Structures are given as C-alpha cells and as structure tokens.
Amino acid sequence: VSAPPATPSARPPHRLGVHVTDAGVDVAVLAPHATAVELCLLDGPPEAPAERRVRLDGPELGLWTASVPGVRPGQRYGFRAHGPWEPARGLRFNPAKLLVDPYARGLVGELGYGPETYGHVVGDDLVGDPYGPADPRDSAAHVPHAVVVDTRALPGPDPAANRPRTPWSRTVVYEAHTKGLTHLHPDLPPELRGTYAGLAHPAVVAHLQSLGVTALELLPVHAFTSEPHLVAKGLTNYWGYSTLGFFAPHAAYATAAARAAGPAAVLDEVRAAVHALHEAGIEVLLDVVYNHTCEGGLPGQHVAWRGLDNAYYYRHLGGVPAALDDVTGTGNSLDFSRTGVVATALDSLRYWADVVGVDGFRFDLAVTLGRSHDGYRADHAMLVAVASDPSLGHLKLVAEPWDVGLGGWRTGQFPPPFAEWNDRFRNAVRSFWLADPGRAAHGLPGHRVRDLATRLAGSVDLFGHGTPPLLRGPQASVNYVTAHDGFTMADLVAYDHKHNAANGEQNRDGSDDNRSWNHGVEGPVTPDSPAADVAPLRRRSIRNLFATLVLSAGTPMITAGDEIGRTQQGNNNAYCQDGPISWVHWDLSDWRANQLATARHLLALRREHPALRPHRFYSGTPVREGGPRDLAWYGADGAEFDHGRWHDASIRTFQMLRVAPGTQDDRVLLVVNGALAAVDVTLAGDADRPWRLAWDSLWEHPGEGATSGGPPHAAAGDVATLEPLSMRVYVLA
C-alpha cells in the first residue's frame, strides 16, 4: 500500500534516522550497496501489521532519504532494503525482511526466533546454509518495530543541565545491573523494582550515598535481544551485550506504566532517573556495546545491519566479503574503518550525552573501535573523534582495553582522555591475597610483592607513558577486583572452581583463570559445619581485597553487592542468569551488615585522605624542599626496600608510606602482611609524627577499633604484630 508522497529531504544529509518536523518526518538511512530502500509505515496489530511503503531517494553518498508528510510521533515503522542476494560477495539483501532502524529512538515488540527472522532459508531447527538461497517469508510480524519519537521538546528537567562533574580523583564507580540492583529491594514499591525509576528511588540513592559512590555504571541499557541458543534453553541474555539499537533504551527495564504509554514515556523515565541521580550528586555512566550487534555470525538472524548492508557495516575476514571477521567472540564485528560506522557510534554517544544527560561511557571491547585493517591504532579516527568531540571529550570515557582479535590485549595503550579497566590490577590483587596463599599452603612459591606494590601506586608502568609522558595520571587506571563477569568477591574466597552448570553449557563457559582460593573447602559453609572455622578467614580475605581496591591510587570500581557479600553460588559467567543467582539480595545477615560498615569506613578513609587519591603519579621525591617524600616503601624491619627485596619472592610483608602536600602533609601508612604466619613489623614514619590505627582487616566491624583494648596511637619504631593475611591503615594522630 502506498503512503503519502515523499519529497527529497532538505535537512543535512548526515542526520540519520527518522526525525520529526512540523510537517511530518525526515528520513535517512545508510545502505551504500542497496539498489532501493523503502520506509515501511506500520499500523494495526503487531502480529499482523498493515503496511504503507515509501520509496526513499538515493543513494547519495550511500544515503537514502526523504521527507514524508503526515507522519507523527508514535508511528511504528521499519525499512526494507532491495539489492542482490549474492552471499559470496557479502551482499545479503532480502526485501522480505523488515529491518529495524539502527537509529530508532524507540522500539516496541519482541524479536521472534522462528525461521522468518533469517535472511537465508533455515529449517524449524534454525539451521541452514547461509550461502544458500534467500528466504521469501515476510518477517514484519516477527521483529520489533521502530517507533517515531519526538525529541525536540522533551518534558521534565534537563538531565544534562545538572551534572555533578565529579573530578576523577574523587570518583568511585559502582557497576550495577539496572534490573538486578533493585529487583529484590524490599524498600522499593513493587512497581519500581528492577526499573529505571527504581535506580533513583530514595532507598537506592541513600545506599549509594552512604557507601560513598559518586558514579553509577550501568550494564547495557541500549535495546538488546537474547541469542537463539539461549532462548532454546529457556534462558535469556541478562547482561545485555547483544545490541539491537544504539539509541533506544531497553524497554523491559521501564515501569509497566511507561511501557504501556510507549517509547516516549520510556525515554522520559530514563531521563528522569538520570536527573534524580544527578540531584543526589551521583553521575551515570553507561556500558556501551558498539563493537558488535545482536545478529551473530552469518548463520544468524537478519534484523537490521545485515539486511541494510552486510558488506558495509561488518568487518570481513582478510578482505573476503563472504566471511566475517570476528574479533569480539560474538560472530560479527562492526567495521570502524567505515565512516558510517564511526558516525553511527558518535551520533549514539551524543544522543545519550545531550538528550539523556549521562556523564560518561564504558566502551565494551574498545580495541575493536580502534581497529584499522592493520590492527589497533591509538590514533584511530573513532578514538580521536570521541576525544575531540565537544559533547563527549569532557565526559568520563573508560575503555575495556582488549578484544579477542590478534593483538587485542592493549591495557595502558589508549589515548587521553580515556581511562581504562586495569586487568593487571585485578590479577595482582587476587594473586597476592588469594592465589599465592593457596599455593603457599601447598608449599608452592607465589609472586613478588613488587607487582602488588606497582598496582597500589597507580600502575605507572601502564599509564605513565605517552606523549607527553605522565599526562593521564593514576586516575586513568580503573582499578577493580571483580566485575559483572567473573566471581563476586564473596565467591572468590569460597570457590576454587567455577560452577556454571545452570548456564546449560556443561560448565565449559566462563574463565578458568580465577585466581581464587576457597580456604580449604569448596562452596558455602554454615555455622554448624565441620569447616565453620574457615568462615572468618574468608571474611578477612574479603576485607583485604576490598581495602586494597579502595586504598590504591587510581579510580576504584566496586561491583554491586560486593559491599554486602553477594554470591552467585560459584557461577563466574552469569550472563544468562536473570534470576536469584544474579540479583542483589538485600537481606543482611550480621556478617553482611559488618561488611557494609567496613566498606563505608574504607571509602570514608579514601575520601578524607588526599594521600590515597593522588592527581599525579608518585615520584618518590619530597613534596617540597625539606619535606617528606610522597611515597616510600619499607620492610617489616622498618628499613627501606632495596633492589634485592623487590626481587625476593619470599618477602610477603611490606609498608607503604604516602604523603600528600598540604598544610598538615596528609600521611597514610599501609602495612600489609601476605604471609601465612604472623609478622612483627617495626612501623615506619617520623618519630615526631605519631600514628593512629584507622583500620585493621582483623576487625569484623570498624567499630572494633574503639573497643579492641589496644593502644590508640603508635610511633615510628614501635613494633606491631600483624596476623597472617592481614593489613592495617595508620593515619596521623
């Protein structure tokens, strides 16, 4: 059925997507190899939509455009792309398939998993030859429909206008899942649990504020789908790293009322949540997935980019258009050597920054975004464009500095102003506190303390180079011990091995390099268990891990629930677990309440002491003429570390003395004992500047410091006995 006649679009050709005008909509879609593209206006029930088609003009520089009168917000639509079906040339045009607009601001409906959603012929088992004939069945009733959303004058306050703009040196990141964080929260009304609105509920805000969190980093909230193999097992993609649209919020996280009102209401709910979090002083960072899409490899579904122009949007192996180059482990990788792919990612980032008001982004598998045909480049057009963009360059930009392609591990190699997830920090902390003691218990050697010391000091070996050197500073190191993928902190101390049977892959999925230690017993222990004596040791190990994270130079990232001892029952790859395994449980036993108090106390120490959060890398030189050095290292005997000690793997005890210049020269002494035996430590420092014990990892609750009966103050040269696998923090009295 024909629609109102279209006219050539007069708006700038780079403005892709469907945009509302006074007369109707302007339309533009990028499909350089297509021979024709139609805008399909959809009415009636989604399971049997009536369709009006508008043929777009083009291609001009690969763009297909039109101005279509009479189309209003709320209109459902999609595209159909015409062209050759020649899989050997990478051309997979099939106009029987309704395609999702990559620029859609809203989506309704669910992706189906029948044969109709495939471009090539497949059987009921969804298996077929991707190089075989095109499938003639229409997919309009089996795919989500894009929805026209008017973003010209949005209701409510502007979330981009009240950004907290927390400096990196004061930033504490809290990585959370939109649903999982609040789905079981007892203080939220049922209708808000697991929603965008729930994130901004006063109970959630109060928890984040009391903890000391300054930035809430959300796992993907771009519209996403579940992989067919998960659906066949009755599972879903819980994390959301399977993007269907880079602009539309994932509607399932909205309240039922917003979903019923439509995509505009979903967008309003997201913006309102961001604004409310800003009012509370909390920034919002988004985990964004531009490296691949939900379409999988060539045997996968045909719902958007593959149908618009498979040969253009995706990387191809060795330049052979028939084969996809998978550097992401998902079956496909977007090709960031293409101007249009770079433009799509930039437009999406600007939309979420300017319209939704978020404060930054964590880029999943960011190396893919910096890949040219000859590999990763720190001066890649995408990275330069983000860094220099007036809407983006001043935001918090965090790279996951790897992908699975050749030369894909690039920690420390992203340009300013990017910060990076520091996997070397994670590995060093886990090794020192868990893997090494586990080995030592069996008479095996561990790592030298220099690795942990380097991470405590901000990882200058990774982030101190560049032109000019030392430009980024220690804040570029996003330090973490756990993240969404892998064991939780409580599971790191309770499991030697992953327990992923619930994922339906015979425990083959998930990493085997966990550097965990179960303290002699696999899994949970109860008070009446014969192994109950390992429980306090595990709790101490959690405190050691958390303290090392929070007290290190750099930007700490906490995984939601670690502050209250969340467990995933040993599952270290809970990407498909939308249920109790992954959700945060808010019922606090005594030890979990103590862990929360400890987390709050440690983060308060970080906040109160500039020596723990330096702007620049430590130099080991005086903070001023005649003053103390900004960093010094000492052994258990109180003598300074020399070259030999750094290389002696038998040494497991050290002291780290840090000083921040100021009127009182803020000083913090960290004393670490990673040995399996108690060690007497001669405290470092100046004789005329006594210490106060601010925290001891032996304390189940930080309040024990006031009731321990020990001396409240200590002087340099005094001897303190550190119990096995423990640490202390001293501040000036």
Residue ranges of model-derived segments:
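Hydrophobic faces of well-ordered beta-strands that scaffold small-molecule active sites
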Residues: 172-174, 216, 284-286, 361, ...
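Conserved, mostly hydrophobic/aromatic
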Residues: 29, 79, 176, 218, ...
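Short, flexible loop/turn elements at secondary-structure junctions
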Residues: 31, 58-60, 70-72, 83, ...
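Short catalytic/ligand-binding loop motif for oxyanion handling, primarily in non-cytosolic enzymes
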Residues: 86-90, 157, 182-184, 224-228, ...
